[in-house]
């Protein structure tokens, strides 16, 4: 198991400003349903093969946290890059 935390600063004031852009960016980075997304209030819950995580808005930052088990843990670098890209795109 591997834990992953990403933080991306933003000038946006809350998840309501980021939600649509974050959904679109994640769909682009993870096409074909590779990553399942579910909104629970202002928290985006994520899941995929061997991975569970969430993205929230905390203190002026988008914060992503995930636990990666097999097979996702073997692709940590790629997952970190794609989630980070989506978060930076949404935060801009």
What are these regions (language model features)?
Residues 47, 56, 65-67:
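Beta-strand residues in well-ordered beta-sheet regions across diverse protein folds
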Residues 28-54:
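Ser/Thr-rich, low-complexity intrinsically disordered terminal regions
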Residues 3, 41-43, 59-63:
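A generic structural signal for beta-strand entry/edge sites
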Residues 11, 15-19, 23, 39, ...:
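Generic alpha-helical secondary structure
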Residues 6-7, 60-90:
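C-terminal structural segments of small proteins and small subunits
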Residues 10-12, 26, 50, 68-70, ...:
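Beta-strand elements of well-folded, non-transmembrane domains
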